[in-house]
């Protein structure tokens, strides 16, 4: 009898559309692999969510949610209470990785290079007392580059100055690192490869990630062998330091001398053309095989 797998998708974060794509693609790949698949669009009604899982009682939950409440430990905590094995990282690793200041502390503890940064309220940023330009302003707990702004000497209109800016009073202010964008998928405790991301946008923002033609993925990244190896080593170390499991994706900047860890994504995109599945395929692992591995290694912290 095939395992019953419920795929969590959608949600109510700013990354809902991305999650719907990930869930649909993962669900289809799991069906191809022989699993009995149920797709569950997760909403704010927690009681309805618990009831749906209680009724179907899957053997494994495939978490294809992105953004707040899906990859920040909230859903993971509910699944732990219900004693349902689920894919990807547990609640603590998810919560730490999603909160940028907490993740930076972990990286620094393990001697993983990070850009100079500070947590500041928006008023101090607007008063130009937080950090000298150029710098990057990031919401503390959003993914997919949502709300990210690069502030240079030429920047006048600051979106986080508006009263309707929805991402909180405090922000992460980080020194802007010029250079190349690299990303490394980690599967278990092994790096899948290194990809260079090339875009005509100022940086790898939401549109560059998801709009047609917004970016190009170069696999493997055309960097020196020692840079390639170090990117993989730092990404595996970050995965382990945070306590991640399943797959994760580390994003780095390379300025020609130093690799800087930007963040680790515990719920990377899961379409067959997303970065981690793309790297897995280059390493000889098909998309159905990748999602199968995630299901077969699923855990919970009950």
Swiss-Prot record:
Q: What is its EC number?
A: 6.3.2.4
Per UniProt, Mg(2+) 2 binds at 263, 265
UniProt keyword annotations, A-Z: ATP-binding, Cell shape, Cell wall biogenesis/degradation, Cytoplasm, Ligase, Magnesium, Manganese, Metal-binding, Nucleotide-binding, Peptidoglycan synthesis
Cofactor note, please?
Binds 2 magnesium or manganese ions per subunit.
Q: Where is the ATP-grasp domain?
A: 104-296
Annotated binding of Mg(2+) 1, by residue: 251, 263
Which residues does the annotation say bind ATP? Answer: 130-183
Catalyzed reactions: 2 D-alanine + ATP = D-alanyl-D-alanine + ADP + phosphate + H(+)
Localization annotation: Cytoplasm
Instruction: From the UniProt record, give the pathway where this protein acts.
Output: Cell wall biogenesis; peptidoglycan biosynthesis
Give the matching Gene3D superfamilies: 3.40.50.20, ATP-grasp fold, A domain, ATP-grasp fold, B domain
Predominantly, its location class is cytoplasm
Gene Ontology CC entries for this record: cytoplasm
**Essential cofactor(s):** Mg(2+); Mn(2+)
Taxonomically, the superkingdom here is: Bacteria
> Recorded GO terms, molecular function?
ATP binding; D-alanine-D-alanine ligase activity; metal ion binding
Supply the InterPro entries for this chain.
Answer: ATP-grasp, ATP_grasp_subdomain_1, D-Ala_lig_Van_CS, D_ala_D_ala, Dala_Dala_lig_C, Dala_Dala_lig_N, PreATP-grasp_dom_sf
HAMAP family in the record: Dala_Dala_lig (MF_00047)
Q: What NCBIfam families has UniProt attached to this entry?
A: D_ala_D_alaTIGR (TIGR01205), PRK01372.1 (NF002378)
Say which family it is in: Belongs to the D-alanine--D-alanine ligase family.
Quote the function comment for this protein.
Answer: Cell wall formation.
What is the recorded name of this protein? Answer: D-alanine--D-alanine ligase
């Amino acid at each position: 009898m095939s395992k019953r797998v419920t795929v969590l998708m959608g949600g109510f974060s700013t990354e809902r559309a991305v999650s719907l794509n990930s869930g649909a693609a993962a669900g289809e790949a799991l069906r191809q692999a022989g699993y009995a698949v149920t797709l569950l669009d997760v909403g704010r009604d927690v009681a309805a969510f618990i009831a749906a899982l209680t009724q179907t009682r899957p053997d494994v939950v495939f978490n294809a949610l992105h953004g707040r409440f899906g990859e920040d430990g909230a859903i993971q905590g509910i699944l732990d209470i219900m004693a349902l094995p689920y894919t990807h990282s547990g609640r603590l690793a998810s919560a730490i990785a999603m909160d940028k200041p907490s993740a930076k502390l972990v990286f620094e503890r393990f001697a993983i290079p990070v850009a100079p940064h500070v947590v500041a309220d928006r008023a101090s940023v607007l008063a130009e007392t937080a950090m000298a330009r150029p710098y990057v302003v990031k919401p503390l707990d959003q993914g997919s580059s949502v709300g990210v702004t690069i502030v240079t000497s030429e920047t006048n209109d600051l979106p986080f100055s508006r009263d309707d800016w929805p991402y909180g009073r405090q922000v992460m202010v980080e020194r802007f690192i010029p250079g190349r964008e690299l990303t490394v998928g980690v599967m278990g405790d092994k790096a899948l490869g290194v990809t260079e991301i090339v875009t005509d946008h100022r940086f790898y923002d939401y549109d560059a990630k998801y709009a047609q033609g917004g970016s190009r993925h170069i696999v493997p990244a055309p960097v020196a062998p020692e840079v390639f190896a170090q990117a993989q080593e730092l990404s595996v170390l970050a995965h382990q330091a945070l306590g991640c499991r399943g797959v994760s994706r580390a994003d780095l900047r390379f300025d020609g001398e130093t690799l800087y860890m930007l963040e680790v994504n515990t719920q990377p995109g899961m379409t067959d053309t997303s970065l981690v599945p793309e790297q897995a395929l280059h390493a000889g692992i098909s998309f159905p095989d990748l999602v199968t591995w995630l299901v077969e290694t699923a855990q919970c912290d009950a």
